[in-house]
């Protein structure tokens, strides 16, 4: 008799749980459909109109080893092209270093690529002067990857999702540890299927 009395409550409990799960799934799907909120300095961030695959070109690390974006599979990657002769690059680089310090790990990394023709010696002078501690030095002296991505001005920053698809870019400098920039990066970390709804570009 006691068990019978509790059955309605059990049934309603199941309904409430299923309803909560449905609402949660709706919220997640809605966020992925609408896309990230572009506020503050990220208002000029350009969301990709189509899901473009990552470039296959390579650049070099500080030891001269060839690296491509495929190395960072399953991570959201922020790729920043910078140069020592570019004042906006110099201003924003410390904030990119702080972004890597706060979010870098299994889900996210920053790839900061110098296009200085002087290579490592020139780039390292600025890295040391700015006391950059959390970024790995990458070099693209011939600007091959920058050209493949259609870089038109410096600095330019791209974000790629976990599947290696370009989801957007920002042309010009920004404070990348600003709360709105961090929120943008976290959106792509938390919504790995966002680019699924975009047209595919070969």
Where are these regions (language model features)?
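Short, Lys/Arg-rich N-terminal segment immediately upstream of the first membrane anchor
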Residues: 1-9
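Hydrophobic membrane-insertion alpha-helices, especially the h-region
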Residues: 12-26
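N-proximal helix/coil linker or "cap" segments that precede and/or mark the start of modular domains
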Residues: 24-56, 195-202
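A short beta-strand-turn-helix
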Residues: 56-77
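Thiol/disulfide oxidoreductase modules built on the thioredoxin-like
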Residues: 125-134, 140-190
């Amino acid at each position: 008799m006691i068990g019978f009395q509790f059955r309605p409550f059990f049934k309603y409990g199941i309904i409430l749980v299923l309803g909560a799960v449905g609402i949660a799934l709706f919220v997640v799907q809605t966020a992925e459909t609408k896309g990230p909120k572009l506020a503050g300095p990220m208002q000029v961030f350009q969301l990709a109109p189509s899901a473009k695959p990552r470039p296959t070109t390579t650049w070099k690390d500080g030891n001269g080893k060839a690296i491509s974006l495929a190395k960072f599979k399953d991570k959201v990657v922020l790729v920043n092209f910078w140069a020592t002769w570019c004042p906006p690059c110099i201003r924003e680089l410390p904030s990119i270093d702080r972004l890597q310090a706060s979010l870098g790990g299994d889900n996210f990394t920053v790839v900061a690529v110098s296009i200085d023709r002087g290579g490592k010696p020139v780039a390292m002078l600025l890295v040391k002067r700015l006391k950059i501690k959390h970024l790995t030095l990458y070099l693209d002296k011939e600007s091959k990857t920058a050209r493949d991505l259609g870089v038109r001005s410096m600095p330019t920053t791209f974000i790629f999702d976990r599947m290696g698809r370009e989801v957007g870019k920002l042309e010009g400098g920004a404070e990348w540890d600003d709360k709105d920039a961090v929120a943008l990066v976290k959106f792509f970390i938390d919504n790995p299927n966002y680019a699924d709804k975009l047209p595919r570009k070969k």
